[in-house]
């Protein structure tokens, strides 16, 4: 939606400038580089091209860099392995790493000193299983962040929230050392692609101003995930982030 693009309209074609703007103007505490162009069903950009872009962004900022693949396991395996190699020692955070590609990405991340985002489809047992597989491979669990899969407002959020509560209870109450990891939620990606975030006021007058609506959807989602134990929120709109930070300061 245009509302999501507006704060970055002067840098949309330049990932390095975009990242620097997020840090310098909007005080981003970390940067997330979402590798949409590598999707085989989209531009199918090469692993080498993606790696060079990641390296340039990493060298241009002084905050942590999270690299999020296209969620096609085979392509992510190739791309994230190459990024691990090209960005040796940059201590990137790489994901999503699933059961299907954990060996290739896990080995590369270990070899080149990166952190991993273990991803599973809204299920406590599957989240634990991916962590066990990574640990069996030799990955230290203190280099793993858990992505339980994130839904936007509605049923998706409720499912994700419920699973995150159970993950937290298993880790803290039951002492399950395979689940005592920080959790990450790729919230902005889900909120801004949903129908309600894009509908103009002519189509849905009862939902109010489209820009404000989507900003509030993202902020409400952020607060919900914070309450369920999230450690890292990936958000898109600066105003949504301000609202989420205001909530944190109240706690």
Q: In which residue ranges do the predicted regions lie?
A:
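A structural motif
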Residues: 27-28, 62, 114, 230
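Acidic (Asp/Glu)-rich catalytic clusters
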Residues: 21-26, 54-60, 81-88, 104-112, ...
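Short acidic loop-to-helix transition motifs that present clustered carboxylates
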Residues: 72-76, 99-102
